[in-house]
Amino acid sequence: MRILIVSDAWYPQINGVVRTLTAMRDQLSARGDEVYMLTPERFWSIPCPTYSEIRLAFISSGAVGKVVKEFMPSAIHIATEGPLGLAARRFCLKRGLPFTSAFHTRFPEYIEARFRIPADWSYPLLRWFHGRSSAVMAPTPTVVDSLAARGFKNVRLWGRGVDIDLFKPGHRQGTADVPGKGPTLLFVGRVAIEKNITAFLDLKIDGTKVIVGDGPMIAELRSHYPDVVFVGAKHGRDLVSYYNAADVFVFPSLTDTFGLVMLEALACGVPVAAFPVMGPKDVVTDDKVGCLDEDLSVAIETALTLCPEDCVAFAKKRSWTACAETFRSYLHQFDPTMIHGADVLSATAS
């Protein structure tokens, strides 16, 4: 199959969306599919306000169409709802091409947290965007149910995996030697308001709090929490070394759809402490590998008693190979010659 994946999220961003799409590209390519990633670096773009590492590529559906006509895919997946996703959606509708889409990020909740715009105002826009999709792929049963309750159609469960060859237990030493006393309490992720990091940092609890990641709030948090260890963004084996140095992985977010970092921590033998909300409820499904509690300090204290071996065994059941097969099964194949056909909708159709 020749698969075109359109995404506004791509390197140098490092987040769950980029990691998931990278895994899909690699897994599908390994099984013999041809995969083309249509991403912002191929076009003129500007930094996203308040998220400078995110590039917004403002292009026409014609520019997207040129790439589509050159690659001649037999399936198109629109991964994000940004400018590239909008242009690709418009091109597909004009040519009568089926496409699938995905719900990776709870943007309405993020917008509400940052700009105080009610989430209920934003969801109709996302429902419109995904309304013509053959399959709207969502990462967990909770997200599937939530979207269906909001009127989204054709929502399908598409789980997530973890690279167990990279994320695995190791020695508590090396590049991630962490100063401080007591257990090491780790957070990995974007340092931004939607991650609810202050709920973790405000806890009066024994141990050393370590923050791995970068983002718009890092300078402010460094100033307000001088006893917290901030190490910036880490990748690959450097990131793994921080997981290996941790006793508990703390995930304070209330808005994530999944949270790949929780699976990465578990694969390294680190139990998870989180709130009982969307994301953690679908990842930490066994009380042997983590604790979900409205009191995050209780969740941490409980997680400290759990067995690392149980965490590793749990994570090994989540493979990217199975995830890619599910993704591929939802794709809507079409005859590539349709790409060069006449427009079936007017320029104003949506």
Question: Where would I find each of the regions flagged by the language model?
Answer:
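Short hydrophobic beta-strand element within catalytic cores of glycosyltransferases
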Residues: 271-274
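A charged, aromatic-enriched C-terminal amphipathic alpha-helix characteristic of glycosyltransferases
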Residues: 305-344, 349
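Aromatic "clamp/platform" in nucleotide-sugar-dependent glycosyltransferases that forms part
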Residues: 254
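Donor nucleotide-sugar binding/catalytic pocket of nucleotide-sugar-dependent glycosyltransferases
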Residues: 124-172, 176, 180
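Nucleotide-activated donor-binding/catalytic signature segment of Leloir-type glycosyltransferases, i.e.
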Residues: 219-237
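Short alpha-helical donor nucleotide-sugar binding micro-motif in glycosyltransferases
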Residues: 68, 130, 233, 241-246, ...
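Conserved donor-binding/catalytic core segment of Leloir-type glycosyltransferases
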Residues: 176-210
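Nucleotide-sugar donor phosphate/pyrophosphate-binding loop at the beta->alpha transition
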Residues: 98-100, 109-128
